[in-house]
Regions:
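Extracellular beta-rich ligand/substrate-recognition surface
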Residues: 116-123, 232-234, 313-315
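A short, sequence-level motif marking secondary-structure junctions
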Residues: 11-17, 129-134, 168, 196-203, ...
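Catalytic and substrate-binding regions of extracellular carbohydrate-active enzymes
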Residues: 1-184, 248-264, 272-276
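Solvent-exposed beta-strand/loop surfaces of large extracellular or lumenal domains
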Residues: 14, 20-23, 173-184, 216-232, ...
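Beta-strand-rich recognition/accessory modules
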Residues: 155, 209-289
Length: 367
C-alpha cells in the first residue's frame, strides 16, 4: 500500500551483505511468507526442505517461518510451462474479481482468492477477500480504504495463526488497531487499521522489529546489512505488526479495515462491523461504504440475511450507505429490506456482487 510514501511493504532485500540466492537472509526471510503481508500458520514440527534452491550456500532445510510451502522437489525451480500448471506448482485460485459501477472511476474493487494449496497439509482451508473503496468523492482527508477478510482453518487447533503487515517505520499499537506513519524523505502518509476480528477479548496485537530484530523469524535474526550505496529510505523495512487470536481454535477469521490519509489527519471515518446471527455473513462499514462477505468466502446459491443496525446511521452520520453484497452465484436475485423488495438484481459470474444504495435495516438476499 502506497499513499504519500510506502506504508505496507514487502520486507527484506536481495541486495546487501547477505541477500543473494541461498544466503541465510534470502532463503530464511526475504523469499518467505513471513517477509510479506500474508498469513502464517505455525506448526512447530514442520520442515522446509530446500536443497535444490539455486545458489552456492546450500542447506538441507530452511527455517520454519510458519508460512507457505516450498513448491517443487526441495524448492526446485519450475523448468517448464507444463510443470508450472501442475498440481505441485498450483498455489491459489481466484474466486471472484470485479469493480464498478464505473469502469473509469470505480467506487469499489473486489478480489477474492483461495490460497489453501499454497500451504502444506497444516492448512485445511485459507481464503482471503479484499475490497478497495475509492473515497475521493466522499472525503478529502481519507481518499481510500480497504477491507480485508481472511478465513483460515488449520489441521490442528494448536497451530498458531498470524496476520502480518510490514512497514518501514515503527508502527503504533492503539486500542482496537494500529497505525503506520511516514515521517522521512518527504513522505507524509498514514495507514490506520481497525481490527474487527478477532474480537477484542480474543485479540493479541504485537509489533516486531527495530534494531536487532528487523528480519526476525521465531527467535532468530537473519540480517542483511545495506551495501555501500546509501539507502536513506530503508525500503527493506524494519518492522511488522502481528495479529493473532489468543484462544486456540482450528478455524479463525480476521477482519480488518485500513484507511489511508495524511499523517496530520486525526479524524478518520467511523468503522463498524456488520454481524449476522446465523454466522453466514461477515461485513464492515467505513464511512458511508459497506461490504458484506459470505462467511466462507465462497458463492451462495440460496442467499443469506444480515442487518445494518439502526445505530449505524448515527455512528456514520448518514441515512444511506453504498452497500456491496458479495459471494453470490450468477443469476437473478431479489434484495429485501425489512420484508419489502428493493428490486431484482443481475449478478455476474466474475464478481458475484450486488451494489446498491441502502438504509439501515434487516436484509434478505434471495432467488
Amino acid at each position: 500500500i502506497y499513499y504519500r510514501g510506502p506504508l505496507a511493504i514487502d520486507s527484506g532485500s536481495y541486495q546487501g551483505s547477505a541477500g543473494g540466492y541461498n544466503s541465510p537472509h534470502n532463503k530464511n526471510y526475504f523469499k518467505r511468507t513471513i517477509a510479506h503481508n500474508s498469513l502464517l500458520v505455525y506448526d512447530p514440527s514442520e520442515k522446509f526442505a530446500c536443497w535444490n534452491y539455486g545458489g552456492s550456500d546450500k542447506t538441507e532445510f530452511a527455517e520454519n517461518d510458519g508460512g507457505q510451502r516450498m513448491p517443487g522437489d526441495r524448492w526446485e525451480t519450475c523448468r517448464s510451462f507444463k510443470d508450472l500448471l501442475s498440481e505441485e506448482y498450483t498455489v491459489g485460485e481466484v474466486l471472484a474479481h470485479g469493480f464498478g459501477p464505473s469502469a473509469q472511476t470505480p467506487e469499489w474493487t473486489l478480489l477474492q482468492g483461495d490460497i489453501t494449496k499454497a500451504y502444506s497439509k497444516k492448512v485445511e482451508n485459507a481464503r482471503r477477500s479484499f475490497v478497495f473503496f475509492n473515497l475521493t468523492e466522499e472525503s478529502e482527508d481519507v481518499p481510500a480504504a480497504m477491507v480485508i477478510y481472511d478465513r483460515v482453518r488449520s489441521s490442528d487447533a494448536s497451530f498458531k495463526k498470524f496476520w502480518l503487515l510490514h512497514s518501514i517505520e515503527e508502527p503504533q499499537i492503539e486500542e482496537g488497531g494500529f497505525t503506520v506513519c511516514r515521517t522521512k524523505n518527504g513522505d507524509s502518509g498514514k495507514l490506520s487499521c481497525s481490527v474487527l476480528l478477532p474480537s477484542e477479548d480474543n485479540l493479541k496485537i504485537e509489533k516486531v522489529g527495530g534494531p536487532g530484530k528487523e528480519f526476525w523469524v521465531f527467535g532468530k535474526i537473519f540480517p542483511n546489512a545495506a551495501t555501500t550505496r546509501p539507502d536513506p529510505c530503508n525500503e527493506r523495512g524494519a518492522w511488522r505488526v502481528e495479529l493473532s487470536p489468543k484462544d486456540a481454535a482450528q478455524e479463525d477469521c480476521f477482519l480488518n479495515v485500513i484507511q489511508m490519509s495524511d499523517r496530520n489527519v486525526n479524524k478518520l471515518l467511523p468503522v463498524s462491523r456488520i454481524q449476522n446471527a446465523e454466522a453466514k455473513t461477515v461485513g464492515a462499514i467505513v464511512g458511508s461504504r459497506a461490504v458484506v462477505f459470505s462467511a466462507d468466502c465462497g458463492r451462495s446459491s440460496e442467499g443469506y440475511g444480515f442487518e445494518v443496525p439502526a445505530s449505524a446511521a448515527k455512528t456514520h452520520k448518514t441515512k444511506k450507505f453504498s452497500l456491496l453484497i458479495s459471494g453470490l452465484e450468477k443469476g437473478e436475485w431479489v434484495v429485501e429490506r425489512n420484508g419489502k423488495s428493493l428490486g431484482k438484481f443481475s449478478v455476474g459470474e466474475a464478481d458475484g456482487t450486488i451494489y446498491l444504495n441502502a438504509a439501515p435495516g434487516k436484509y434478505l438476499v434471495r432467488r
